């Protein structure tokens, strides 16, 4: 019965938490879903940010001190609707508006059904039987951005065009009026698979008049987990399965002149680790449909409370010794057919003026996979941290490598600690995890 103030962002790795808590918590609960990633809401990244400090203090004053300050008079959910915009991986401000939802679930949100057909997405079901076979290269998904963006360099999804070209795409009609969405998109599919395991990745994209493709939401379903993540269900090659792909919750307003695209693939690397075998998934279009949570005009036109401007305490006095930097690049080796995604981040170096303590850090991520070989998938994470003062220095260096074979995942880790040039501690790990469902 603990009161809950649930706060997250559509670009976070947990965009569904707020609505699930509102659905299931019996204690006093309020939710705020902004547009930011895995950062505090006052920091934005992307913005707009809000006065999260004031919001949290008011909540604690009510439930820890007993102040009758009216926080429970606020709407059940405050959510940011992103407007259609060109794709950019940078954490810049996103256009849009806040909406207030007084109760959740809300009777003002209705399901709009679009049926899959040979000509795209349509409000009327297809009258002809038509199957589409989907088989995607193992490197499909490289434009999807980071799983947990923290307002770093180019972490958000880029133009989805390259991945759309590797997917089965279903486009809806161009809109002549805005379409406002808030909630959980659901994709109902009738599928068969030619292997004993398979994966379906679904992406919703906002297609602009110039053809650029902006990722709105995505969902991934391992067909062996179609009946729940707590059980493994067999996949019988050629046998039809009725499955539901739950896409991430979203708040989005598709503007006139734009249109919706559903892109389906059998890979989403590196967001999802590839299964041991490549598989072809066949979709019965006449038995498949997409349900969208459409916001009613009553909510859309309701004034929202002022969420304020970001507030925070002043940082400790410091000087910048070295500016931060970073890079993100994709490389395809045509000889080895390896695809490499490499992300580097240098947080720079700062010195705290009152103590003279200097701090710096660097990190890197390398995602490698070879065309046609799902067992070649390899991820390397490195992170180094250094503290120094005058002629004294300590640092840690860490490395994690994730690989696999047909029966297990391999996690090999190492961390070393130094004082000056002297190694003072070293530990290594070798974990082997059976591939039960993946």
Predicted regions and their residues:
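Short, proline-enriched alpha-helix->beta-strand connector loops that line the catalytic pocket
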Residues: 2-4, 27-28, 109
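Short beta-strand/loop motif that positions the catalytic acidic residue
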Residues: 6-8
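Acidic beta-to-alpha connecting loop that harbors the catalytic carboxylate
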Residues: 10-11, 36-37, 267
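Conserved alpha/beta-hydrolase "acid-adjacent" motif
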Residues: 12-18
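Active-site phosphate/pyrophosphate- and oxyanion-stabilizing loops and adjacent acidic/basic residues
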Residues: 19-20, 58
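Catalytic histidine neighborhood in serine/cysteine hydrolases
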Residues: 26-40
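Catalytic histidine-centered segment of alpha/beta-hydrolase-like enzymes
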Residues: 37-49
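C-terminal, loop-rich substrate-recognition/catalytic regions characterized by aromatic stacking residues
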Residues: 46-418, 422-438
